[in-house]
Amino acid sequence: MSNTTGFTPLLTQSRVDGDSLVFNVSEDWTQGRTAFGGLQAAMALTAMRKLVPAHIPLRVLQVTFIGPVLVGDVTVQARVLRTGKSVTHAEARLISGGETGCLVVGVFGSERESSLKVDNTVYPELPSAESLKNMPLFPGITPRFLEHCALRWARGTPPFSGASEAHTGIYIRLDEPVSSEAHMVALCDIIPTPALSMLKRPAPASSLTWTLELLRNDYNETSAEPGWWLMDAEVTRGEGGYLSQTALLWDAQRRPVALSRQTVTVFA
């Protein structure tokens, strides 16, 4: 990958402008004409983390993708909405070309004592990542940001293959280990909507809203090389150009790590 910017350098090389952070988004982190949604959320989280203590874990991100976040300087304005006994709410806005392109609310919560413990998740038994091949990249069709990722289909088929169902199980990884909340946020937005697999020819799709719930905070990879994570995703309802989908992310120890819910618009 020549002339590309790593995920960590892109976030850490931001500059301060008054009460805002300014990030420089490069072409290799785009999907279509806008920045990769996972990167947008990660930039918002980075700005919120300047205001929220690191010892309070991120629990939920609520993201609304409003308009294009263009290549070049992106200004992120963050503020704390409220700090309670256990939970802090913060907000971040991404400004691109003078317009708000993305609005993010972060919910950070300290652990509290509880007698309840519920886990109804079931790990999907699928072929191993090592037995599968990476999805090839097609310039002009696959989003540029996928240069920084790898995807291997264990269930379902890649986009535009005429699949019979909108349900996929995809092993995913970034090109650097998941070592922070920001990495985790970006990782959870890598996959395409499973609905695209049902189409027989390319068509654009775009996330409209995204809610990401982190189910644990002991997920950081400690190895020097990135590992594989499994994202099990399914469209539960789609009509009139709008899709509702849910995805569950599993780590290499088969532990559920994150729950992702999105409303996606598709132009087909």
What are these regions (language model features)?
Residues 1-268:
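Terminal targeting signals and extreme-terminal segments of soluble enzymes
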